Every structure is written in structure tokens, then in C-alpha cells.
Amino acid sequence: MADNLEPLEPSLQNLVEQDSLKWIFVGGKGGVGKTTCSSSLAVQLSKVRESVLIISTDPAHNISDAFDQKFTKVPTKVNGFDNLFAMEIDPNAGLNELPEEYFDGENEALRVSKGVMQEMINALPGIDEAMSYAEVMKLVKGMNFSVVVFDTAPTGHTLRLIAFPQVVEKGLGKLLRLKMKVAPLLSQFVSMLGMADVNADTLSQKLDDMLRVITQVNEQFKNPDQTTFVCVCIAEFFSLYETERLVQELTKCGIDVHNIIVNQLLFLQKSHDSCSMCASRFKIQEKYLDQIADLYEDFHVTKLPLLEKEVRGPESIRSFSENLMKPYDPKAEPKE
């Protein structure tokens, strides 16, 4: 039966045309070109969506290099685009990575809450990184972007990112259960410091608000109409092994994944002589491409070329992004 099935379109056109998608994650092993692929996908989405945000959660922050423009923890418009924005967060920095404006208020209550919240969170192992994502999600949801693309860190960090809603829900649940015990102590503490306008209700309300947002995000992450994951790999053993592990973990978490990008491929022309190394690499890639075809026959598998020049700058990414929408044809490559 499976042999009679038509192969799925070898592109990301299915994602670009799925206008219900809200969150798109792009991830894989380090060094496979995730940032180029996620940036290219964001560019294509900007053609059909009202507003697009790409977020780097990789401490290396490669999207600044990709677009040749410095980005910060505040969404910034990408040069050359009217509706594409980018921001970079460091998941290891916890709440300290958030824009200060987030904690602005008419008094010092929210600023004090930031410090108190950080201390309380530090008492719960493993939740700090997750809380950073949680706060970013709260910020992003308030900005009403049509779709958000995550340029994720290598696989281990990515799996933690995917799991963060459950971690935060569990952690916040513990904090809120302790709320009644903590509130009187916190009120006494701030009164001793002469800050009568600060009370535990401020912190409590903030935690309640965050839990509500994260519960909603958790539901959206597991809804294939709203969230999907794009795996990026190269045609080598370790990358393919990591991709299979990632696909299995995503499936276990209930995250939709049906697109794989195989990057940095050689497209040798039989009519041209090639060096022995190129021919050897080509054979290796062909072997793993066959394995990918067998493993992921029910996936959209997009094949991208290894280029002579690096893909950097908005115009270069805009040009490269076309390869996501239709199969790459080396014969159609413009001659210089």
C-alpha cells in the first residue's frame, strides 16, 4: 500500500500555506544550517502573513550574523522588510534577560517583584530557563504577531524548550500553593524596607497571569494546526541519528513534525568533471539520502544545496529562501 503513495511535496510550501500556524520551531544538530533555514522560512512567511517574528534561543545568536544586523531582546524590524521582526534571547539568563520595560509600573512594585520572583524561582531546580521562555511567550503573545519562528539551539536545548510549558506549569503550581504562606512574610519584609505600596498580591497576580498564558501556550504547542517543528540535518550519520532522536522525542511530547530539511547537499552534474573528494562526498550523501527517504516517507523532505558563498545579508537570504518553496535546480542557478 505504502509503495503506491505519492511522495509528499519536497518543500516547505505546506507550512507557508498553512495560515493557522502560530508557532514554528526549527532545530537540529549544531552546524547543519538551522539559522539559514529558519531565517529563510521567516522571509517566505513574511510574503503571506501580516507580521512575522523570528526568535533566536541559541546563545550563539546567529540571526544577527545571518541578516548582518544587530538584534536584541526587543523585537526589531529586519532591514529591507516591512513586516519581519527579529529578537534574540539567552535562555540561560533567566528573567534577567527580559526587557526592563516589562517590569515598569507606576511604582516600584513590579521591579521588586522581578527580584523576588527570581529568588523564588532559583529555589526550584530546572525552572529558571523555562521561566525565561515563559516570560518571552507572554511578551510575544501580547504583540500579536501572525506567526513566530524559533531558531533554536542544538538538540538538547531544543527539547528543553519544547518541554518548558509543562515545567513552568508544574513549578508555578508549587509557587501558587505556597502563596498563602509566603504572602504574610513578603508583606512584612517590604514594610520593614519602607515600601508600603508593594505587597505580595503583585507577585501573586503576576504568577497567576503567567500560569494562564503558559497553560494556553502548552495547549497550542500540542495542536498541529497551530504548532509544528522543522528538523534540519545534513546527509551524514551523526546528523541523521540526532534527527531521528529528535523526531522520536517530539512525537513523545505530542509536537507535530512532518517536515525535514536536508541541507548542504552537493548537486554534481554528470556532464562536468568533479574532484575526487566531491565525488566521494556525493556518494556518501546519496547513501544517507536513501535512508532518509526510507525513514521519512510520510514527511516533506526539502533538499538544499551547499553553495560556494555563505548566505548572509537580507538579499542573500531572500534569494536562498526560494529553495524552500520549490526543489533546487542547479541548472537554473544564475551565472556570474
Swiss-Prot record:
UniProt keywords (A-Z) are:
ATP-binding, Cytoplasm, Endoplasmic reticulum, Hydrolase, Metal-binding, Nucleotide-binding, Transport, Zinc
Database matches in CDD domains: ArsA
Record-annotated residues binding ATP? Answer: K29, G30, G31, V32, G33, K34, T35, T36, E236, N263
Q: Where in the cell is it found?
A: Cytoplasm; Endoplasmic reticulum
Supply one GO molecular-function term: ATP hydrolysis activity
Residues annotated as binding Zn(2+):
C275, C278
- What Pfam families does the record tag this protein with? ArsA_ATPase
Q: What is its EC number?
A: 3.6.-.-
Catalytic residues at D58
Classification via InterPro entries:
Anion-transp_ATPase-like_dom (IPR025723), ATPase_ArsA/GET3 (IPR016300), ATPase_ArsA/GET3_euk (IPR027542), P-loop_NTPase (IPR027417)
Single Gene Ontology BP annotation: tail-anchored membrane protein insertion into ER membrane
Please give the chief subcellular localization of this protein.
Answer: cytoplasm
User: Which Gene Ontology cellular-component terms appear in the entry?
Assistant: GET complex
Q: Which superkingdom does the taxonomy of this entry point to? A: Eukaryota
Name the protein family: Belongs to the arsA ATPase family.
| Subunit structure comment from the entry | Homodimer.
HAMAP family listed in its UniProt record = Asna1_Get3 (MF_03112)
Name the job this protein performs: ATPase required for the post-translational delivery of tail-anchored (TA) proteins to the endoplasmic reticulum. Recognizes and selectively binds the transmembrane domain of TA proteins in the cytosol. This complex then targets to the endoplasmic reticulum by membrane-bound receptors, where the tail-anchored protein is released for insertion. This process is regulated by ATP binding and hydrolysis. ATP binding drives the homodimer towards the closed dimer state, facilitating recognition of newly synthesized TA membrane proteins. ATP hydrolysis is required for insertion.
**Protein name in UniProt:** ATPase ASNA1 homolog
